[in-house]
Structure formats: structure tokens, C-alpha cells
Amino acid sequence: MSDSNKEKKKKFADMVSKRKGDDQEDQQTGDLSEELNILKERAVQLEDHLRRAVADNENVKRIMQKQISDASDYAVTKFARDMIDSCDNLKKAMENLKDGDPIHEGIKVAHQKIVSDLKKHGIEEIDPIGNSFDSNLHQAVVEREDNEKEPGTIVEVLQTGYTIKNRLLRPAMVILSKKSADCESN
């Protein structure tokens, strides 16, 4: 064979070899590109999981802070119930004593002090006279005929109700107005 043929064969072999190398490179590039896409998808999934975990953590933290705050605010509930029973007893004692009696005045001062101290801790009396009945705050005991008031208006409080930080501690026991039978038939 002549040198030129050998050269041509060599060039041809080099060209075939180069194409095989290019094909292998293309295959490797395709494989790497596919692997990169898989890794990108996985990174997006992990980022989403991380975001959710952080949000869940924040929610748990917020809930725990609320529970701690509520526990602090309402820790005195049992004690407050005992104190409002004492207030009721002092009121009953004052009702049975005459105004101006020194004992009456002493009980009145003690009652006012207890009510004042309860207010300092977020415990407030419910004063519903003249308001419409609200089953969330009041307990109706009886209805009384009263044609001057709208039916369902609170006309008397039998037992004072209390709230603690806007949560019901004890409902007010009340008497409601109703129209007389004579007015209803007219």
C-alpha cells in the first residue's frame, strides 16, 4: 500500500475514533444532564420540606406561647371562684344589716376591697341590668311580667356573674321581663 492510502486509512480511522469519542461524550453529557435534573428536583423537594418544617415549628412555638399565656392568665380561676363566693356572703351580710351600722360599714369596706383586688387580676363583675339576655353571660332563673320593658330584658340580678380576662367565670343569675298575659291578648 502506498503512503497516501495509509494516510487516508489513518485519517479515516482517526475520524471514526473521534466520532466514537463524540458519541461517548454526548452520552456522558446526556447522563450528567439527567442526573443534574434529578438533583435539582430533589433540592426543590428538600427546600419545600424545610419551609414546611420551619412553618410547623413557628406554629408550635406560637401555640405554646398562647397556652403559657392562658395558663398564667387563668391560673387564679379556682381561687377567684372561692373569692367571689366570699363576695356573695359579704353582700348577704350587708343586706341583713342596717345602713350606718358600724358592722355594715366594715363589711362594705371589706367587700369593696375584695372587688377592687379581683379587678386588678382581670376579674370583673357582670352588670347586666337593663341589657338583653345573653345565654353566654347570663342564666335566666325566672320571668317577671313587666309591660314597660322589652321581653327578655334583665330586670333583676339574683346572683352577680363574673368574667376573668373576658372569659366567663360564673354566669349572672337573672330575672327577665315578659309581657303580661293581658298585653299579649290585645
From Swiss-Prot:
One Pfam match: GrpE
Record's compositionally biased regions (Acidic residues): 23-34
Cell compartment(s), UniProt: Cytoplasm
Gene3D superfamilies, per the entry: 3.90.20.20, Head domain of nucleotide exchange factor GrpE
Alphabetical keyword list: Chaperone, Cytoplasm, Stress response
Record flagged with keyword Cytoplasm: yes
GO biological process, alphabetically ordered: protein folding
InterPro entries from the UniProt entry: GrpE, GrpE_coiled_coil, GrpE_head
GO molecular function: adenyl-nucleotide exchange factor activity; protein homodimerization activity; protein-folding chaperone binding; unfolded protein binding
Ranges of Basic and acidic residues composition bias in the record: 1-22
PANTHER family in the cross-refs: GRPE PROTEIN, GRPE PROTEIN HOMOLOG, MITOCHONDRIAL
Family designation: Belongs to the GrpE family.
Name the UniProt record assigns to this protein: Protein GrpE
Species annotation: Wolbachia pipientis subsp. Culex pipiens (strain wPip)
